[in-house]
Amino acid sequence: MGPRARDLGVVIGRLGPGPHNAITDVGGVRVGHATVVRDEPSVARTGVTAIWPHQGDPWRERVYAATSILNGYGELIGIDQISEWGLLHSPVVITSSLAIGLAYDTTAR
């Protein structure tokens, strides 16, 4: 892996990184992750990451959000609402394209 932008002198934003250089340096942000690696009864290599924007109820206490399409590939549910309202009302869930429906259904429950 090559050098990070910061190592090359690139400054992004006005604030520096937090003490752990992690998304969880932001107060209230929570991150959960699960990885599945198995060979029986069938081969599975997958995972899911969920990011909660704060400790409250994201459906009632929405946060500002924006989107950016980097390469035009991938599945994204909720982009229209973020683009129209500029608000996020759920956790951000990152998973494979084939698991996005299950992630959406689980998050909506």
Could you describe each region identified by the protein language model?
Residues 1-109:
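Alpha/propeptide regions of enzymes that mature by internal proteolysis
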